[in-house]
């Protein structure tokens, strides 16, 4: 959690600090990812059980507490898995670089890069579909920016090569995000029928 403010106020310098640290996966998950991933889960739980999804046409879909809780647990697990998958993707893509970082370092990097996406979950307190999409898009752009800033120093490569690596990673990340969003829509939109 100590890097959250720095990722927004001075991201270039903060990425260099993160790269110099030798944080373990367990420490990173317990002190950053588990807490940050809880933000969208808790906000979505409150928003969908107390206010309900607003589709903009006056239709509101409210979930029961039990359904909301079951879906929140699934949503949380999917987000934690998403960070692990992206860490693995970065590690796999870096296989041909002479200074290949460890899998643990790649997962830590992926967790910090995902911070804007986690924080964008605050908007789920008022689950208006177009507002969630807008805030999520802005968060995705900033996540891409953090990726472009961090990859060159993370892999010790030049900015041109970093741009290529970051673009590939971002493309895979967007694909993973789309899968997560599809699962989220299915779980939060239709999950009440499953539970």
From Swiss-Prot:
GO CC term, one of those recorded: plasma membrane
Membrane topology: Multi-pass membrane protein
Residue spans, topological domain Cytoplasmic: 1-32, 88-107, 158-169
GO biological process assignments: DNA damage response
Primary site of residence: membrane
Subcellular location: Cell inner membrane
One Pfam assignment: Yip1
TM helices/strands, residue ranges: 33-55, 65-87, 108-130, 135-157, 170-192
UniProt entry keywords in alphabetical sequence: Cell inner membrane, Cell membrane, Membrane, Transmembrane, Transmembrane helix
Highest rank taxon of the organism: Bacteria
Periplasmic side: 56-64, 131-134, 193-195
Entry protein name: Inner membrane protein YohC
